[in-house]
Each structure stands twice: as C-alpha cells, then as structure tokens.
Regions:
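Bacterial Sec-dependent N-terminal signal peptides
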Residues: 1-25, 313-317
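N-terminal ordered "arm"
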Residues: 22-66
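Transmembrane beta-strands of outer-membrane beta-barrel proteins
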Residues: 25-29, 69-73, 115-121, 161, ...
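Outer membrane beta-barrel transmembrane domains
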Residues: 37, 81-82, 206-318
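Glycine- and aromatic-enriched membrane insertion/assembly motifs of diderm outer-membrane
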Residues: 51-80, 123, 280-284
C-alpha cells in the first residue's frame, strides 16, 4: 500500500514538472482546404499546407513581453470553379501554385499590442508543383480528376514582405471573457501587394489569456514555467481588403506570356471566424474563412466569393 502511494506521488510530481517546465519553442502545421467546409466545394484557393517552427528570442526591451522568431515553408494551390474535362476552356480563375519559404519575427507588447513582420522567397507557377500535388491528393482520397492544368500561369520568382499590427481596444475596461482588437496588415512583393483592416474579437469559454500568452497570434511559448494551461475561445474577424496586385490572378509582373489572366476586383470584404483551443503543450484550431470576389471575368461571369476551412495543430517544446 505504501509503495502504491509513493508511486502515485512520484507520478503526480513528474506530471507537474513536465507540464510546468518552460516551453520556449513550438512546431506544427496548418492545412487549408475547401473540403473542410463542403464536399461540393473545390474552387479558387483550393488547398494550402504550411509547416512552422517558432522559438523565443532574447528580449531586453521592458515594453515588449515576448519576441518570437519563426520559420515556415508552405504551398498554396489555386484553380477555377470548373475542373472537369468538358470545361477546360471555361475558366474564371487561373490554375497556379505558390511555393515559399518564410522567416519572421513577432513582437508582443505589455499593452497587448502585436507587431508581426515576415519575408518570403519562392516560386509561383510550374516550379511550385501545384499540379503534381493536387493530382496526387485527389488520387489518394478518391476525389474527381482535375483537368485544365495545361493552362496554368507561367513561372514567377517570389519576393514578399508582410507586416501585421494589432491593438487592443478599451484596455482599461478589462473583461475576463471578451475583448476587441483593431487589426491591419499589408503585403508587398512580386506575388501579392495589398492592404487589409478590420476588427477581431475573442469570446472565451474559459478566462481569456493575455494576448502575449495566447495562441491567437501564436504566443504560447514562454520562458516562465506554465502549469495546467487551458485556453478555449471563439473568435471573429471581419475585414476590408484592397488588393493592388495578385500574380496568381494577373500573372507575373515581369512578363505577359501566361495563357490566361484576369483583371482584379480590388475591393473585397473578407471574414474569418472559428475556435481555438490549448491544453498544456497542445494548440489546435478550426477556422471558417470567407473571401470576397477577387477578379472580373466578363466572358463567363461566374467568379464569386468563396469559403474554405483551416485546421491548425501545434506542439510546444522545451
């Protein structure tokens, strides 16, 4: 009996030490697909996959709670609404893929403001392997065959910069279960150039963590030991986007040899909402994302707003 009590005590102590250790890094993935919202949906931004690794960086600024460095690799795939053999000549968006590597740094302030910056290098076009990835994925899951990749956009080299700033609204009126943030971001590069602005709210099923400890903007890593951390909330983020340039629609800015391109619909309304959860070392989320109409297609006039789902999973490391 005594040995049993000792074993239980040691198990509890080991569990406490394991979950109470500082977690200074996180590894994980993000997968996007329109099938996560509807089995009948397979158009426009149709698939995305990102692998990430982030870690805490040295910080000597008293106004900054955390400084986080992050690396990612990812691939996005785009196709028109119709991908059957009979509709190869009916296109309301180009086929293309985008493959990239990314390095970024995030600054989480004591005021719960956030500044994120990142840079990408990569390729759009055949070098991005969108055709091979989509055809293999459809074959594996037994989904319909895709026709039309012979019309995909030609190669373009990607150099991208991105910045996002978020500011907590009404910081003096603290509430354990709801908050509101103003958020703006900008992209500049050879593939995407545009700006977005909007509002984001969290509604907690449990007491909300401060933004600099929350997984909302990927700040779960910490130098401080954390004990039995739980986070579970709904979030919503409506925004307005003005897109100046999009190579996945217009083709490369350095050539006009692609077989099929379109003019942009520059002003769009976008929305995102979902659930985010954390239990100790595990982060996970599901998001439903809506994108407004992105281009003008006078010949077919079928392009419209669309939606897709995003699933994220991360694991915190020592």
């Amino acid at each position: 009996m005594r040995n049993k009590k000792i074993f239980i005590a040691l198990f509890i102590l080991a569990s406490t030490l394991t979950f109470g250790q500082a977690k200074t890094a996180e590894i994980g993935f993000i997968t996007d697909n329109d099938l996560y919202t509807s089995s009948k949906n397979d158009m426009y931004y149709t698939n995305g996959l990102e692998l990430f690794y982030r870690f805490l960086s040295k910080n000597n600024n008293e106004k900054i709670n955390k400084k986080i460095t992050e690396f990612r690799i990812g691939q996005y795939i785009y196709n028109p609404r119709f991908i059957n053999a009979e509709a190869v000549t009916i296109n309301d968006r180009p086929f293309t893929g985008y493959l990239f590597a990314e390095a970024g740094r995030s600054f989480f302030y004591q005021s719960e403001s956030v500044l994120k910056t990142d840079f990408q290098l990569g390729f759009m076009g055949p070098n991005a392997l969108g055709k091979e990835t989509q055809e293999s994925f459809h074959h594996i899951i037994g989904y319909k065959e895709v026709f039309g990749w012979e019309n995909q956009l030609h190669n373009a080299f990607a150099v991208q910069a991105h910045v996002m700033y978020s500011k907590k609204m009404f910081p003096s009126k603290y509430n354990d279960f709801i908050d509101l943030h103003f958020q703006s971001e900008a992209n500049l590069g050879t593939i995407f150039t545009g700006v977005s602005t909007g509002f984001l709210t969290r509604i907690g099923f449990k007491k909300l963590l401060p933004i600099y400890d929350s997984n909302l903007h990927d700040a779960s890593v910490s130098f401080q030991p954390q004990y039995n951390i739980r986070e579970f909330y709904f979030y919503a983020m409506p925004s307005v986007n003005y897109q100046f340039y999009d190579a996945t629609i217009q083709g490369s800015m350095f050539s006009n040899t692609s077989p099929l391109t379109f003019d942009l619909e520059p002003l769009r309304f976008n929305a995102e909402f979902g659930l985010k959860y954390r239990h100790n070392n595990f982060n996970m989320s599901y998001s439903f994302i809506y994108r407004g109409r992105e281009l003008r297609d006078p010949e077919t006039n079928t392009n419209s707003g669309y939606f897709y789902g995003s699933i994220r999973f991360g694991y915190l490391l020592k």
